[in-house]
Amino acid sequence: MAGNTIGQLFRVTTFGESHGLALGCIVDGVPPGIPLTEADLQHDLDRRRPGTSRYTTQRREPDQVKILSGVFEGVTTGTSIGLLIENTDQRSQDYSAIKDVFRPGHADYTYEQKYGLRDYRGGGRSSARETAMRVAAGAIAKKYLAEKFGIEIRGCLTQMGDIPLEIKDWSLVEQNPFFCPDPDKIDALDELMRALKKEGDSIGAKVTVVASGVPAGLGEPVFDRLDADIAHALMSINAVKGVEIGDGFDVVALRGSQNRDEITKDGFQSNHAGGIFGGISSGQQIIAHMALKPTSSITVPGRTINRFGEEVEMITKGRHDPCVGIRAVPIAEAMLAIVLMDHLLRQRAQNADVKTDIPRW
């Protein structure tokens, strides 16, 4: 299966399935001499892992990461870093009844069309469980970006269903189970989730991720534009059906005089572009949003077919998230970090000696 690797100089390759023995990844391109321990990776894994809230799947995986290679005496060696997380709470029997049935809205049908077979246990390779390794790899990138360049990457939920959320307090994000930055909406989110669990249904969400302190000049013309690579990375996350950079689709209703980010001697006067012009970072905050569909793993009956072409009624059993967008926040942060680290290394490799007299803010 191709398509398991992202990045050029900072490269992340993941492997593993939802109900396999383990998940793993190989991280190439990490510079030597960076202090790194398993504890550095565990914080973000704990933010993503299942079973930590009554609002997410009750599959209880500790997601304890092991560093297998690339670190000696507490620092990176510059060689490939191997990471592994063992699966410990698989309940494959939950899926035995659907081994011949295509769950509507899932990858069951398309995987079988492509490969002629599929791992029906929890979706196999198509499961969001795979993203645990992205978060582990992304934690390496976040540490490097923060310590070497002062870059901070933060994400939060900015909409669930028809409930929009304002970014009022970043410190609140880690203090509630929704990654919600809006203290006035937490009760409404709680009420919605309770209703969904009672109905056996699910809901979509919007996640916003912001990178601060990114230097100007990252990104490559034409096909490796920074925003193109960010969109690619975020779109690769399970259930994501749309990505916006900056004002995104809202620019359709704006005029050029409103949308252009004017510059004065004091700096940029707005950031409609999300910190990227011509595919290259401007030094402003990089802002991206992603829309996640409601999961199709619900107990509301739905129509589908089996592999013999017969129509059947489908009710999903097992342990699932009523809103997959909640746990997507640390995944979005990880993917943005991976892209930024890759482009920083590429910029240093080609343009390390470039200096300009143009102001930077």
UniProtKB/Swiss-Prot annotation:
Presence of the UniProt keyword Amino-acid biosynthesis in the record: yes
Named cofactor requirement(s): FMNH2
Record: residues binding NADP(+): R48, R54
Reaction catalysis annotation: 5-O-(1-carboxyvinyl)-3-phosphoshikimate = chorismate + phosphate
Residues binding FMN: R125, S126, S127, N238, A239, G278, K293, P294, T295, S296, S297, R319
Cofactor note: Reduced FMN (FMNH(2)).
Superkingdom of source: Bacteria
Record GO biological process: amino acid biosynthetic process; aromatic amino acid family biosynthetic process; chorismate biosynthetic process
Assigned GO CC terms: cytosol
Family: Belongs to the chorismate synthase family.
Protein name: Chorismate synthase
UniProt organism field: Shigella flexneri
This protein's encoding gene: aroC
